[in-house]
A protein has these predicted regions:
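Sec-dependent bacterial lipoprotein signal peptides
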Residues: 1-18
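Membrane-proximal, proline-rich intrinsically disordered regions
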Residues: 3, 18-68, 256, 310-311, ...
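Aromatic-residue-lined binding/catalytic grooves and analogous aromatic/hydrophobic interfacial grooves
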Residues: 18, 224, 229-266, 484
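Conserved, well-structured interaction surfaces
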Residues: 84-154, 185, 200-207, 250, ...
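Structural register within alpha-helical repeat arrays
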Residues: 136, 143, 150, 230-232, ...
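Short coil/turn linking the two alpha-helices of tandem helical-hairpin repeats
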Residues: 151-158, 209, 236-245, 390
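Elongated scaffold/linker segments in the mid-to-C-terminal portions of large proteins
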Residues: 258-394, 445-485
Length: 485
């Protein structure tokens, strides 16, 4: 894995106008006046998504190693293969000169830079109307998503940081040139900027019917996806004082509840659960980064990491197998059945239990969409947020509704009370392999027990990645490193 990196925040460069859904790559958008029509805007927006499909870089994106980041750092996954592609994550081997800390940093700021450039060119062109507002809302939501995930990787989580004045990330809310000297904003400013972008995205998209339509917005951040992200962000903030409030759980619950009650999505049925993972844009899917046979991260894809014939660097941990897969108490739970977690090997190599969430499409193991937001997560957000706002009855009902579609012969109403540990266990069962585990535990003040690093407490120095040294050097020390690196 050898990448050539330029200084972060100097990414306001040629902007690809590739429509990842149905067009071949065309000329770069390298002019300040390149976007002149709504069609130009459409293809430029698709160019932002393109950065996360493996076409710009095979490393560090949602459809590859970043999509498994919190799983590999957590308790429930282990590295079996010996290719050492993602051991900076799974074995806590990250350094300031390492490949993945640089790859994720580079790629996410490149994604933000593309979004910024498209927004600025659209405003400069004077484009207006509902279609333009829908695309602009999409861009604000994407920028919020990229900033949020950079904050999760490179800064401590708000609920475990010593203070919201602690270091957040560099915020890129406009196109920046090579003279820009990056400095890290506070955690407070970081999360307020993320929420401001989401509020703007939702305000722009809410009046526009097309942004509420599931079928016409597949592979794009629509109105519901922006709500889903805002719910997730507020859940991470818990009772931290941001935007003048500490009642973020109430806000998270309101957004999740709106999606559950009014959105065009429905929970996977028990009978369908094992078959949905080979499909795109299914009934639960709120937002996916799309891959195709042409646009995917190849051997650094979700499918290749989670297969014994691939890198086999994301198998189920022994503790997960013992706690759930082999535990008779979970024998009727479809999520840990042989249809979802299977013992496999590559001949005599890489024998372990593997998730079946990334089987590939059309016979290609590389081709798996990253399911960034699903309706199941909204039920789990609602349950956790309700529990934390003392509505324990509602919390139990959300878990009960989910279990009804996941456990054979389940009697509706069986779950009458839950603890926070019950909710976190439900998240481990439902969302494993989708990039949540370690962050879920840490933000709730709980340690993880990684198969290699063993106990990693919330707020530990190695819970985050180091800032790439090349970027610190370029800033002449203005960009500060995370402690411990």
């Amino acid at each position: 894995m050898k990448l050539k990196y330029i200084a972060a925040f100097a990414f306001a460069v040629a902007l690809a106008s590739c429509d990842i859904l149905d067009k071949e790559p065309s000329d770069s958008w390298d002019s300040g006046s390149a976007i002149q029509t709504v069609d130009d805007l459409k293809y430029a927006v698709n160019g932002v998504y393109e950065t996360q499909t493996g076409n710009v870089s095979q490393f560090g994106n949602y459809t590859g190693d970043f999509g498994l980041f919190a799983d590999m750092k957590g308790s429930d996954y282990k590295c079996v293969g010996n290719n050492n592609q993602a051991t900076e994550i799974s074995k806590y081997m990250a350094t300031a000169t390492g490949n993945l800390p640089e790859a994720i940093y580079y790629l996410f700021y490149k994604s933000i830079a593309r979004a910024n450039k498209v927004m600025e060119q659209t405003k400069a062109a004077g484009l207006t109307g509902d279609e333009v507002n829908a695309y602009m809302g999409e861009l604000y939501a994407l920028r919020a998503l990229f900033h949020f995930d950079l904050a999760r990787v490179y800064a401590q989580l708000p609920t475990v940081a010593k203070s919201m004045d602690d270091m957040g990330i560099v915020l890129a809310t406009k196109t920046l040139d090579y003279t820009f000297v990056p400095e890290r904003a506070s955690l407070k400013d970081t999360y307020e900027t993320i929420l401001a972008d989401l509020d703007k995205a939702i305000d722009l998209m809410e009046p526009i019917a097309s942004t509420h339509d599931k079928n016409s917005t597949t592979g794009h951040m629509n109105y519901w996806a922006a709500l889903a992200l805002r719910a997730r962000v507020n859940l991470y903030l818990d009772d931290v004082n941001v935007n003048g409030t500490t009642e973020h759980n109430k806000l998270a619950l309101a957004d999740a509840k709106k999606i559950i009650e009014e959105g065009p999505y429905s929970l996977y049925k028990y009978a369908d659960y094992t078959s949905v993972w080979a499909k795109e844009f299914t009934e639960e899917s709120i937002f996916e980064f799309q891959t195709t046979s042409q646009y995917n991260p190849q051997r650094n894809s979700l499918g290749y990491y989670t297969d014994p014939t691939g890198y086999a660097e994301a198998a189920m941990s022994d503790s997960f197998v013992d706690d759930f897969v082999k535990n008779p108490d979970y024998a009727k739970d479809i999520r840990v059945s042989t249809g979802m977690i299977k013992e496999e090997s590559d001949g005599t190599k890489n024998k372990a239990f593997y998730t079946q969430k990334y089987p590939g499409r059309d016979g290609q193991i590389y081709v798996n969409n990253a399911k960034v937001f699903r309706l199941s997560e909204m039920y789990l957000i609602a349950a956790e947020a309700a529990w934390k706002t003392n509505d324990k009855t509602a919390a139990a009902k959300y878990i009960d509704d989910l279990r009804k579609e996941r456990i054979a012969d389940y009697v509706a109403g069986s779950t009458v009370s839950v603890t926070i540990d019950d909710i976190l266990t439900e998240r481990r069962l439902e969302l494993n392999g989708e990039g949540h585990m370690a962050w879920d535990m840490w933000r709730n003040g709980k340690s993880i027990n990684n198969p290699v690093a063993k106990e990693v407490k919330p707020g530990a120095y190695n819970a985050v990645f180091p800032i790439p040294r090349a970027n610190i050097n370029t800033s002449h020390g203005a960009l500060k490193q995370n402690p411990g690196f």
